[in-house]
Structure formats: structure tokens, C-alpha cells
Amino acid sequence: MANVVENLGKLERRVTISLPKDVVQKEIDARIQKLAKNVRMPGFRPGKVPLKMVAQQYAGQVEAEVLSDKIGQEFFTISRAENLRVAGQPSFAPKEDTQQESAYAFDATFEVYPEVKIGDLATAEVERSTTTIGDAEIDRTLDILRKQRVHFHARGEGGEHGDGGADTAAQNGDRVTVDFVGKIDGVAFQGGTAEDFVFVLGEGRMLPEFETAALGLKAGESREFDLKFPDDYHGKDVAGKTAQFTVTLKKVEWPHLPEIDADFAKSLGVEDGDLTKMRAEIKENLEREAKRRTQSIVKNQVMDALLKISELDVPKALIEQDQQRLVEMARQDLAQRGVPNAKDAPIPAEMFADQAERRVKLGLVLAELVKANGLEAKPEQIRAEVDEFAKSYEDPKEVVRWYYSNQQRLAEMEAFVVESNVVDFVLGKAKVTDKEVSFEALASATAQA
């Protein structure tokens, strides 16, 4: 008898599954007999419990298990016979109105994968960012590296680096050590008092009123000031309230940036301290980083372009599955940050609805494009990417071994190669406009993506 597949919508389908009761009962009896060999009941030795008593206690459970197994097996058989590309998990429900004495009947409702229509790639528009690394970018990087290695010296102390000038008052950029006491309506509050508290003026770590009060003070001086906490301040007990603070400055230290010399170059890993080599290595690293960032931007551009020219209906079941996947990823992220009970965090799946739909839709489009154009990752491509990635580490061979020792890591690299193949394929057919951008703009664009 041919299976009738009902069309309930664009992607939703339904089939009826019929299971002969004698076949089901035969399997139930076989499982109960097997179960009886190990069942323990008071008053009976193991394996000696009467079969009738075992059936009375376990028949309902065993019947449910058998029906579940048989329904799943039959649905798999039907889906293969009818060439159904089932998306997600089907739902099964008893077909009450057609129950027969000789058979169980169930409705299986499910979705199928959609037909994916990808438009003319020649109509896709992609803006490709390019950047040139010159002396200005190298100098900016050196400035950042110098600031990361800053040393502080107390204002007024003598020594190799002087005293930072005649003015010993706290200035922007100085590191200050303070004691402070805060009260609201004359009462101290939690977190409002501290001793030997250290921060750098001008970094924005403290509220503006606090930084303003510390500016211009010299060691041993105090200042009183009012501070209104923002309404959205993280400390709910004081949010929106005004506190009266007294801050006492104990120490002022001025920043001393290291000179760009051989010692500085050695601190960056240039063994002989050669400044030309140092600049060349910085340039190489910046070019590698620029390449990575431009690839990321152009990949997103290509993916957006593919979505614009593609037509398909997205299975709800796949969206719901991906929403749950994103919820679990969010919980794992919270756990890594040390949030208590993160695995049970009440994160609503609905907040990921749009993101999940885009991810699923893009996955279907990419799968169709890869299949239609033979863009699968080749072993030599995967190895080339692993080797390229390993170059930035001290022991490239160990990094390569690390990748090839774990199938999941290798699968992630394979997915990256497939995406790269897709990007190259689309760029070869789309309308591509090259745009020169600065390294700073490039870094900003990828940070916001």
C-alpha cells in the first residue's frame, strides 16, 4: 500500500503510520520475557518472578517503548521510500478517529527541507576593503606598545628619570593612590569607603566627579565633593542617589614611557635588539592582522549578498533547534565568566529568533552553493590553512599536530576552508568594488561586527 504524504503548507507534511497490533504485541512479549530474567521482586529469587506478574507491572512501560521504537523505524522507512528530506524532528500523535482493532494508527507531522533558489551571482554587490600598512601604522602600534610598558615614578622623587616636573599636583595621566569615605545622608554605605585605592586619572575608570576631585591635589591634601550616582548605576542601593565624599590623596606618580631602543626591541622578542628588524616584524604582524580583518569583513559582505539574491522558505523546526543551540552557547559563556548557576539561567529562546533564522537560512544557501559548484574543502586546502595559522606560534609543528589530533578542531578548519571557497567563488562572479581604508577604520569595523 502506497504511503500518502499530505501537504499541510509550504514545508509542513503529514503521513499516517500504521502498526499491526499483533506485530507490536509480539515485540512486547519478547521484551517482557527478556526483562523477567533480571527482575527482582520481594519473595522471589532473581529471574524466578512469574511472567504474569512481570507483565502486570511493566506492560505499560514496555508497550510505550515498543511503540516509540516501531513508530520511529516506520517513519524512517516511509521517509526513505518517499524521498522525503526531513528537517528537524517529527511529532507523532495517535490517530484516534481511525483506530482499528488490528492496528495502531499515528500521524507524523514534520517539515521538509526547502528548495533553494540562488539568483544570478553577477547581480551581487560586494565592497572589498583593502588597507596598506605604512610607517604611520607602525608608529601608532609602537606608541600602544610603549603605553603597555609604562612605568610610574613618584612626583618629587629624584633619580634616573627626574621628578616629572616641578608641579607635584595630580594631573591627567598620573597614577594616584587615595583613601576615600562616602556617605549618603550621613550614613556610610557598602563600597563607599576604601584605603590605598589606585587608579589612573583620565582613563575613565572612575565617575567624572571623582576624577575631577582628585585632579590638582598634592600628597596629603583632601577634598570634599558631592557625587550623584547614575540612575542605571550597577550598585542598585545607591543608583540615582547623591553621596558626600571625602578623598585624601596619598601618592601621585607620573607616567614614564620607555624609550624605543635596543632594550625595548628585545622586550618585543627581537633578540639582537635591531630596531629595523623590530619595525619589520611589527609590519608583518599588522599585515597579517589586516588580512584577517579584511577577510572577515568581505566574508560578511558575501554572506549578506547571497541572502539578498536567494529565495527559500526556512523550516521552523531548524530555527527552533538553532535557538536552543544559541541559548546553550549563551549559558556556557555565562559559566565561563563565573556566573553562578549559569547552566540553568532563564534565557528566553525568543531573543535569538532573528539570529537563528539568519544562521539557518545562510546554512541552507551555502550548502546548496557548495553542492552545486563543488566547493567542498580539499585535504590539501585544510593543511595549507593549518600551516598558515601555525606560523604565528613559536612551535608551528606542535600547532599542526594539535589540530590533526582532534577531529572537532579539524572540522572547524574544514568549515573555514569551505567558507573561503564560497567567498572566492562569489567574488569571481559578483560586482566587486575595492575600497581603501585605514588600519584603524578596519579594526573599528571588525570590532563592531
Swiss-Prot record:
Gene Ontology, cellular component aspect: cytoplasm
The family database entries (InterPro entries) matched by this protein are listed as: PPIase_dom_sf, PPIase_FKBP_dom, Trig_fac, Trigger_fac_C, Trigger_fac_C_sf, Trigger_fac_ribosome-bd_bac, Trigger_fac_ribosome-bd_sf, Trigger_fact/SurA_dom_sf
Q: Which Pfam families match?
A: FKBP_C, Trigger_C, Trigger_N
Q: List, alphabetically, the SUPFAM superfamilies matched.
A: FKBP-like, Triger factor/SurA peptide-binding domain-like, Trigger factor ribosome-binding domain
Q: Which domain of life is it from?
A: Bacteria
Q: Where is the PPIase FKBP-type domain?
A: 173-258
Supply the EC number(s): 5.2.1.8
Q: What protein is this chain from?
A: Trigger factor
User: Whose protein is this, by species?
Assistant: Burkholderia mallei (strain ATCC 23344)
- Annotated keywords: Cell cycle, Cell division, Chaperone, Cytoplasm, Isomerase, Rotamase
Gene this protein is translated from: tig
The reply to whether Cell cycle figures as a keyword in the UniProt entry is: yes
Lineage, broadest ranks = Bacteria, Pseudomonadati, Pseudomonadota, Betaproteobacteria, Burkholderiales
Subcellular compartments:
Cytoplasm
Q: Which family does it belong to?
A: Belongs to the FKBP-type PPIase family. Tig subfamily.
Q: What is known of its domains?
A: Consists of 3 domains; the N-terminus binds the ribosome, the middle domain has PPIase activity, while the C-terminus has intrinsic chaperone activity on its own.
The GO biological-process annotations, alphabetized, read as: 'de novo' cotranslational protein folding; cell division; chaperone-mediated protein folding; protein transport; protein unfolding
